[in-house]
Swiss-Prot record:
SUPFAM superfamilies: RibA-like. Binds 1 zinc ion per subunit. It comes from the Bacteria. This is GTP cyclohydrolase-2. The active site is at D127 (proton acceptor), R129 (nucleophile). It holds the Pfam family GTP_cyclohydro2. The gene is ribA. HAMAP family: RibA. The lineage of its organism: Bacteria, Pseudomonadati, Pseudomonadota, Gammaproteobacteria, Pasteurellales. It comes from Histophilus somni (strain 2336) (Haemophilus somnus). Zn(2+) binds at C55, C66, C68.
Length: 216
């Protein structure tokens, strides 16, 4: 039985609409997670949802080294357009290695390692995250059927094994630019992510991203 607890709840107005922010705590680790909820999610219809792992650099500092910030904004926008849904903000920074170690991994990437090689060089697995807590959060929220906004097959498999019915995978290919194309390529080739890239419709326009993405 899960030890995660629902400990706080309030309204949260955002640029994408008014959500209900729900706070969860896992006593064993003292780790806190939150979910943004919009509309009625307790009927029998599948719920549009996103499991979004924490990324300070992408979500708050607008880093172009990953696609995280773009995925966060797109997911919230799509949930708002649907009028109902859930975004779980999963507090596993840097694929579970933490912020400082992520910066160390970035330094190794500056020297030529890819995102997986950098983690391994620091003594970590390619992905240290545990998504099972997200299934517990869905259960506490009363969500049983999910249309999951993700490119990550591991999230889907973990939810299914934990009793959450994933009725559809909704692709989330956004935010590609010349700084993260190799990162996305690595996730697709080495981690099996369902990523469509080197495609003009997914490229972002910004002052620093005008160069053509190099062909592989």
């Amino acid at each position: 039985m899960s030890k995660i607890q629902l400990v706080a709840e309030a309204k949260l107005p955002t640029e994408f609409g008014i959500f209900r922010i729900v706070g969860f705590e896992f006593p064993d680790t003292q780790k806190e997670h939150v979910a943004l909820v919009m509309g009625d999610i307790n009927d029998d219809k599948p719920v549009l949802a996103r499991i979004h792992s924490e990324c300070l650099t992408g979500d708050a500092l607008h880093s172009l080294k990953c696609d995280c910030g773009f995925q966060l904004a797109t997911a919230l926008r799509q949930i708002s357009e649907a009028g109902r849904g859930v975004l779980i903000y999963h507090r596993e920074e840097g694929r579970g290695i933490g912020l400082i170690n992520k910066i160390r991994a970035y330094a190794l990437q500056d020297q030529g390692l890819d995102t997986i090689e950098a983690n391994l060089a620091l003594g970590f697995a390619a992905d240290e995250r545990n998504f099972s807590v997200c299934a517990d959060i869905f259960a506490l929220l009363g969500v049983k059927q999910v249309r999951l906004l993700t490119n990550n097959p591991n999230k889907i498999e973990t939810m299914k094994k934990s009793g959450i019915n994933i009725v559809e995978r909704v692709p989330l290919n956004v935010g590609e630019n010349r700084y993260n194309t190799e990162y996305l390529d690595t996730k697709a080739k080495k981690m099996g992510h369902f990523i469509v890239h080197n495609n003009e419709q997914h490229l972002i326009a910004c002052p620093h991203c005008q160069e053509e993405i190099p062909k592989k």
